[in-house]
């Protein structure tokens, strides 16, 4: 299907109206109208649209890759680090994966309408609590074009409209993808404003999005610490923090060192630029003369720079690169204290053969996910068996951990009566 027609473009008009705030708010109002339709769509209709969107992305792969090549070229000329280039870059295999992700979302259960609990009161009133869409979901994210499609798929399946504000570094890629998605919506007779792309060249568009009270129901920032902190600090609409991951691997005195080495290397080197990568290695002081040299050598042999005398900033850093901070701790409780001081509430891991130590660690470490003898890289919606995710929440309200379809819903109480009135 063609995405030539400008009428199908999801970009907010940057010429008229001239006021950027009004542009963003106008997009949000259109999204609210679209959300009313999406909230009542059948699962079958949503699934057809998701398959159509996957087909459209594949049909327009040449346009998507050409747009992405221009983004990557501009990023390289601007001196963007290779770790960030890797996040930005698309290739035919990655586009295939993006389309496959939409089909995977189509295969997931529809959360809308799910009854969570119910009861009949003594007066005969019948109560049930069921899932309903959030409404208009704003996404603010950095240079990862796949997030554009992931966000569309998850918001559509959960009955929400999406307002997307991606990075200017991925502007061409995001536009090509949104054009393909909106083409599929048009083919299915669904509101094009189910997904809209906000201007990315002016940072003020973020401010207008996150302060659109009454128009936007929630904003989800996905990116580095600076982006997330700025959105949470300045927002006037509800936000869900995602992603910043200063994840630790603690090697307990009882650890199987072969296992510890394997877990550590996987957690650090599998994909160092993602939020569930290990950023700090904690080693029990009892292992200083035995396991520690071996673990450091294994990291260095894998190309990791080990910060053996880390600064305060390095202990708090989300490197997103082949770097890791190293700290020696005086036992289990010291490791727990260190993690609760420097961690970001994402994912923490212990390697141990001591069941009591493992239980104490899981009970006392404050994080969305706590691993025992497993890599931090498993904190992922697909790995957890939830399907795709819109991010990993590091806060405690409304959601925590990998955010899939259920986390993109709220609840509504439905009460059936037969003329009951409340006594005075």
Swiss-Prot record:
GO molecular function, one term: glutamate-5-semialdehyde dehydrogenase activity
Catalytic activity, reaction form: L-glutamate 5-semialdehyde + phosphate + NADP(+) = L-glutamyl 5-phosphate + NADPH + H(+)
CDD domains in the cross-refs: ALDH_F18-19_ProA-GPR (cd07079)
UniProt xrefs under Pfam families: Aldedh (PF00171)
PROSITE patterns given in the database record: PROA
Chief location: cytoplasm
Subcellular location, record wording: Cytoplasm
Domain of life from the UniProt record: Bacteria
Record keywords: Amino-acid biosynthesis, Cytoplasm, NADP, Oxidoreductase, Proline biosynthesis
Keyword hit for Methyltransferase: no
GO biological process: L-proline biosynthetic process
Regions that span the bilayer: none
One GO cellular component term noted in the UniProt record for this chain: cytoplasm
Function description: Catalyzes the NADPH-dependent reduction of L-glutamate 5-phosphate into L-glutamate 5-semialdehyde and phosphate. The product spontaneously undergoes cyclization to form 1-pyrroline-5-carboxylate.
Name of the featured protein: Gamma-glutamyl phosphate reductase
């Amino acid at each position: 299907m063609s995405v030539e027609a400008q009428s199908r473009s999801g970009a907010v008009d940057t010429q008229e109206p001239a006021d950027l705030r009004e542009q963003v708010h106008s997009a949000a109002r259109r999204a609210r109208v679209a959300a009313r339709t999406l909230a009542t769509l059948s699962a079958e209709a949503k699934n057809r649209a998701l398959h159509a969107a996957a087909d459209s992305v594949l049909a327009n792969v040449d346009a998507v890759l050409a747009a992405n090549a221009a983004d990557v070229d501009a990023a390289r000329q601007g001196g963007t680090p290779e770790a960030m280039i890797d996040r930005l870059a698309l290739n035919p295999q990655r586009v295939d994966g993006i389309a496959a992700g939409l089909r995977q979302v189509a295969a997931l259960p529809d959360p809308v309408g799910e009854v969570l609990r119910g009861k009949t009161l003594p007066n005969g009133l019948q109560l049930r609590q069921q899932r309903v869409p959030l409404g208009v979901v704003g996404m603010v994210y950095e240079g990862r074009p796949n997030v554009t499609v992931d966000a569309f798929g998850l918001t559509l399946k959960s009955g929400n409209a999406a307002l997307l504000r991606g990075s200017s570094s991925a502007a061409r890629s995001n536009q090509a993808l949104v054009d393909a998605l909106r083409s599929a919506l048009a083919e299915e007779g669904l509101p094009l404003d189910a997904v809209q792309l906000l201007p990315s060249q002016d940072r003020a568009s973020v401010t207008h999005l996150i302060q659109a009270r009454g128009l936007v129901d929630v904003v989800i920032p996905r990116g580095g610490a600076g982006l997330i902190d700025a959105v949470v600090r300045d927002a006037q609409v509800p936000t869900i923090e995602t992603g910043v991951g200063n994840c630790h691997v603690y090697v307990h005195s009882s650890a199987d060192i072969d296992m510890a080495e394997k877990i550590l290397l996987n957690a650090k080197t599998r994909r160092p630029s993602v939020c569930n990568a290990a950023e700090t290695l904690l080693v029990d002081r009892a292992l200083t003369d035995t396991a520690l040299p071996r673990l450091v050598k294994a990291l260095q042999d894998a190309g990791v720079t080990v910060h053996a005398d880390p600064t305060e900033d390095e202990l708090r850093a989300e490197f997103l690169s082949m770097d890791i901070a190293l700290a020696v701790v005086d036992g289990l409780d010291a490791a727990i204290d260190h993690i609760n001081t420097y961690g970001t509430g994402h994912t923490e891991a212990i390697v141990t053969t001591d069941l009591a130590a493992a239980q104490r660690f899981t009970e006392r470490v404050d994080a969305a996910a706590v691993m025992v003898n497993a890599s931090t890289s498993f904190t992922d919606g697909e790995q957890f068996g939830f399907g795709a995710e819109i991010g990993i929440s590091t806060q405690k309200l409304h959601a925590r951990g990998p955010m899939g379809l259920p986390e993109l819903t709220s609840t509504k109480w439905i009460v059936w009566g037969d003329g009951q009135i409340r006594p005075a």
